[in-house]
């Protein structure tokens, strides 16, 4: 609990420094608190980036954390800066993704409203994530759908 109180009392720069320089093992309560911060509209985008890096460093093997990061991307993309979401997609490289994750990411990329938003950096990060995590062809079916969209075709390397 000491880390949560200390964290809350810091300004944005202090929070980023604390997360970047953190040594030791953070408490479960602190990690859970940080996960909640990802969905707050009051948290600065640069702080969210440090939270994402922190979580991928200390919780890369936690399914619930991975699910929350995927949720941040696919359900909260309208409420967050593209930079934050692109970093979230990049940090997912450190987590194990399953078929459901591939489906959610693919569905977002196929969504017409999302495509009209022209989020180039996020789209590139998501396609790179799918390509990198495509071990054993587990996401080939999603690539077939995505290849039908002209703007995605060149980015997809099967």
Question: Where are the regions that the model predicts?
Answer:
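Generic L/I/V-rich hydrophobic alpha-helical segments across diverse proteins
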Residues: 31, 124-126, 143, 149, ...
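Charge-rich, low-complexity amphipathic helices
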Residues: 1, 52, 56, 73, ...
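Structural detector for internal amphipathic alpha-helices that build alpha-solenoid repeat scaffolds
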Residues: 13-25, 46-63, 83-97, 117-135, ...
């Amino acid at each position: 609990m000491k880390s949560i109180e200390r964290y809350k009392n810091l300004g944005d720069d202090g929070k980023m420094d604390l997360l970047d320089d953190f040594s030791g093992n953070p408490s479960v309560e602190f990690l859970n608190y940080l996960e909640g911060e990802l969905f707050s509209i009051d948290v600065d985008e640069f702080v969210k980036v440090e939270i994402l890096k922190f979580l991928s460093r200390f919780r890369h093997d936690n399914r619930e954390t991975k699910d929350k990061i995927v949720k941040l991307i696919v359900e909260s993309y309208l409420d967050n800066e593209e930079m934050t979401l692109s970093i979230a997609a990049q940090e997912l490289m450190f987590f194990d993704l399953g078929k459901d994750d591939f489906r959610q990411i693919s569905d977002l990329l196929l969504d017409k409203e999302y495509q009209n938003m022209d989020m180039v950096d996020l789209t590139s990060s998501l396609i790179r994530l799918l390509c990198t995590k495509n071990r054993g062809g587990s996401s080939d079916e999603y690539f077939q759908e995505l290849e039908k969209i002209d703007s995605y075709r060149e980015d997809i390397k099967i």
